[in-house]
């Protein structure tokens, strides 16, 4: 049987040891930074596809969730729509119709394009924020 030993760079080990028990609070801060960037891009894209007849209710319900711990132990943050609407319809349903269209109404994608457009900027901002948080410790 073969053995394999992996040695991490000393600098990385020092940074990881600094985090220690503060990993949860640091990861929340980092996720909120990335979530804010994606939220801004989704909001801008949604504004660009909405018609002048829009009530603004969908745009007003767009927001960021709290950072939650998933079943697998990963921290998650979500960009989404608050419920319910004043007319009884679901904001998620309205957003889905705008994103994918329906019979007689063409699709006006805003979520998929926001994800694609904000990915690089989000990763860079989260990386920078993580390094800032580690340096504070």
Predicted regions and their residues:
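Extended beta-sheet lipid-handling architectures
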Residues: 79-81
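Long, charge-patterned amphipathic interaction tracts in eukaryotic proteins
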Residues: 88-90
């Amino acid at each position: 049987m073969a053995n394999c030993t992996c040695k991490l760079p000393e600098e990385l080990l020092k940074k990881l040891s600094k985090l220690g028990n503060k990993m949860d609070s640091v990861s929340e801060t980092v996720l909120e930074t990335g979530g804010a960037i994606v939220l801004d891009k989704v909001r801008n894209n949604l504004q660009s596809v909405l018609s002048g007849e829009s009530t603004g209710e969908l745009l007003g319900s767009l927001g960021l969730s709290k950072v939650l711990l998933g079943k697998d132990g990963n921290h998650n943050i979500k960009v989404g729509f608050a419920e319910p609407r004043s007319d009884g319809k679901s904001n998620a349903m309205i957003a889905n119709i705008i994103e994918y269209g329906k019979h007689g109404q063409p699709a006006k994608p805003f979520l998929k394009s926001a994800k694609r457009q904000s990915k690089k900027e989000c990763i860079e901002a989260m990386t920078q924020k993580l390094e800032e948080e580690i340096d504070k410790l």
